[in-house]
Amino acid sequence: MILFGSTGSIGVNALKLAALKNIRISALACGDNIALLNEQIARFKPKFVAIKDSKNKHLVKHNRVFIGQEGLEQILTECQDKLLLNAIVGFAGLKSTLKAKELGKNIALANKESLVVAGSFLKGAKFLPVDSEHAALKFLLEGKKNIAKLYITASGGAFYKYKIKDLNQVSLKDALKHPNWNMGAKITIDSATMANKLFEIIEAYHLYDFKEIDALIEPRSLVHAMCEFKNGASTAYFSKADMKLAISDAIFEKQDTPILEAIDFSKIPALKFHPISTKKYPIFKLKNTFLKEPNLGVIINAANEVGVYNFLENKSGFLDITKCIFKALDHFGVPKISSIEEVFEYDFKTREYLRS
């Protein structure tokens, strides 16, 4: 297996699972966490290693260290392994997804942004979903026909119990306290704004070629997806909130190993589902427009990344993330995109506009 994003929460969990099944790790790539990368190199002995910045190359305890996006593409070309787990965060993961598709590799995709910004250019790719909701949908949809609607669930994020009027006072520390999941900083903020769920709906559309998709808040994160059929029946996928299950579904050939403790249905409290309030989560107003106009993805994602990283660096407030997205959409409208090069151009233009 090739693992990009090895020091993030998905990567760390994937390596625990790889050790469980003695999966060979041929390549590791990370951003700046060189100390953890060196531990992973010592444990898994990959042939190839990549890091984000050449200034850290001398710190890496390996004799084949590649640098940046070009380095990732070189590894994909040179490494014969058929499986890439792409757990790079954000738009930075797109080039690796495109290259892996070109090379015919199986792509265990944790980098949902690849599909959000360039789904129409990734048709025919061999995807294995790593998001818990999409792994759940895959299970529910297998061999099924006559589907009326799909649902994925959201926890509501760090501010689910907050009043709307209190959201302009929240701190970064507050925003990083996810009630159910242990995740990286960016996706935790995306969960708090509901950008993550908006992106997951578009990801589901591209993965399963189905537009009747919605999301509901299920605060306990025990139900991950539901499938409604034309005859009125529905099915649901239950599991405890732990990413290892979805990762194992993607990287294991057989699903015969106990990964999580099963839910004891006699002990869980009553489950409740709630519609997502667009007053509290205004980003979710974009759902129907986004499904009609998937080209909006590159604008929404770039603006979201600018807004989130400004917030993470204490340059702006929590509510400014959403304002950033609507400002970019007002300026650019629906982009006409006919080539993958234009996706990169619009990403660049959006970031430049918001930083000017």
UniProtKB/Swiss-Prot annotation:
MF GO annotations: 1-deoxy-D-xylulose-5-phosphate reductoisomerase activity; manganese ion binding; NADPH binding
SUPFAM superfamilies: 1-deoxy-D-xylulose-5-phosphate reductoisomerase, C-terminal domain, Glyceraldehyde-3-phosphate dehydrogenase-like, C-terminal domain, NAD(P)-binding Rossmann-fold domains
Biological pathway: Isoprenoid biosynthesis; isopentenyl diphosphate biosynthesis via DXP pathway; isopentenyl diphosphate from 1-deoxy-D-xylulose 5-phosphate: step 1/6
UniProt cofactor(s): Mg(2+); Mn(2+)
InterPro entries: DXP_reductoisomerase (IPR003821), DXP_reductoisomerase_C (IPR013644), DXP_reductoisomerase_N (IPR013512), DXPR_C (IPR026877), DXPR_C_sf (IPR036169), NAD(P)-bd_dom_sf (IPR036291)
Protein family: Belongs to the DXR family.
Function as written in the Swiss-Prot or TrEMBL entry: Catalyzes the NADPH-dependent rearrangement and reduction of 1-deoxy-D-xylulose-5-phosphate (DXP) to 2-C-methyl-D-erythritol 4-phosphate (MEP).
Protein name in the entry: 1-deoxy-D-xylulose 5-phosphate reductoisomerase
Organism: Campylobacter jejuni subsp. jejuni serotype O:23/36 (strain 81-176)
Lineage: Bacteria, Pseudomonadati, Campylobacterota, Epsilonproteobacteria, Campylobacterales
